[in-house]
From Swiss-Prot:
Biological process according to GO: proteasomal protein catabolic process
Localization (cell): Cytoplasm
Family: Belongs to the peptidase T1B family.
Activity regulation annotation text: The formation of the proteasomal ATPase PAN-20S proteasome complex, via the docking of the C-termini of PAN into the intersubunit pockets in the alpha-rings, triggers opening of the gate for substrate entry. Interconversion between the open-gate and close-gate conformations leads to a dynamic regulation of the 20S proteasome proteolysis activity.
One GO molecular-function entry: threonine-type endopeptidase activity
PROSITE patterns noted in UniProt: PROTEASOME_BETA_2
Known EC number: 3.4.25.1
Summary of subunit composition and partner proteins: The 20S proteasome core is composed of 14 alpha and 14 beta subunits that assemble into four stacked heptameric rings, resulting in a barrel-shaped structure. The two inner rings, each composed of seven catalytic beta subunits, are sandwiched by two outer rings, each composed of seven alpha subunits. The catalytic chamber with the active sites is on the inside of the barrel. Has a gated structure, the ends of the cylinder being occluded by the N-termini of the alpha-subunits. Is capped at one or both ends by the proteasome regulatory ATPase, PAN.
Family matches, as SUPFAM superfamilies: N-terminal nucleophile aminohydrolases (Ntn hydrolases) (SSF56235)
Source organism per UniProt: Thermococcus sibiricus (strain DSM 12597 / MM 739)
Propeptide segments, given as residue ranges: 1-9
Pfam family, one: Proteasome
Species lineage: Archaea, Methanobacteriati, Methanobacteriota, Thermococci, Thermococcales
Originating gene: psmB1
Name this polypeptide is given: Proteasome subunit beta 1
Length: 207
């Protein structure tokens, strides 16, 4: 868990549901005690049914995403199908472990849907764990206070979205480095979808 000391200024949440995966993140980027952006994207589509959420240095996250997208396209060209979630997580782990002395500063969530929904968390040294739900970043303790009490393996995607928003919102209320809106992505049998700002605000009002 040593890598968490390097990660400030964001909160991400991932949840495995019966029928898909939810990834959420706030939109604030900070440098020290200063907010430097209020509209940062922290969740990225890698392929039709694959995505990465990152907590940490924005430049490092973007560099990793570019590498994963390139490898994913190459895999499709060679094999003729999309990479599995586990394969993408393993690839991410291998890339990170190969840069231990010049690391990507971040904590990464890989979510996807192939034969079933799955979710992996990967630290910047390449340590990998498969999770049912996970949070990373400066507000993770507040997000976990919600997730630990309310998560169920029987949760549906719709209810998983509500739970993820509730968890991120708890971090926004308590963590000064987390804020400025919530990005929500779902991945199910049909593929990757980002909820609109209006959809998220509507769900927030119902909390």
């Amino acid at each position: 868990m040593w890598a968490l000391d390097k990660i400030k200024g964001t909160t991400t949440v991932g949840i495995v549901c019966k029928d898909g995966v939810v990834l959420t993140a706030d939109r604030r980027a900070s440098l020290g005690n200063m907010v430097i952006s209020k509209g940062v994207t922290k969740i990225f589509q890698v392929d039709d049914h694959l995505a990465l959420a990152g907590a940490g240095a924005v430049g490092d996250i973007l560099s990793l995403v570019r590498a994963l997208r390139a490898e994913s396209k190459l895999y499709r060209a060679k094999v003729g199908k999309e990479m599995s979630t586990k394969a993408l997580a393993t690839l991410t782990s291998n890339i990170l472990s190969g840069r231990k002395y010049l690391p990507y500063f971040g904590w990464f969530l890989i979510g996807g849907y192939d034969e079933k929904p799955s979710l992996y968390s990967i630290d910047m040294a390449g340590g990998i764990t498969e999770d049912k739900y996970v949070s990373a970043g400066s507000g993770m303790e507040f997000a976990y206070s919600i997730l630990d009490n309310e998560y169920s393996e029987k949760i549906t995607l719709n209810n998983g979205v509500k739970l993820a928003i509730k968890a991120i919102n708890a971090a926004i209320k308590r963590d000064v480095f987390t804020g400025d809106g919530i990005m929500v992505v779902t991945i199910d049998r049909e593929g990757y979808r980002e909820l609109s700002k209006e959809e998220v605000e509507k769900l927030l009002k119902k909390l």
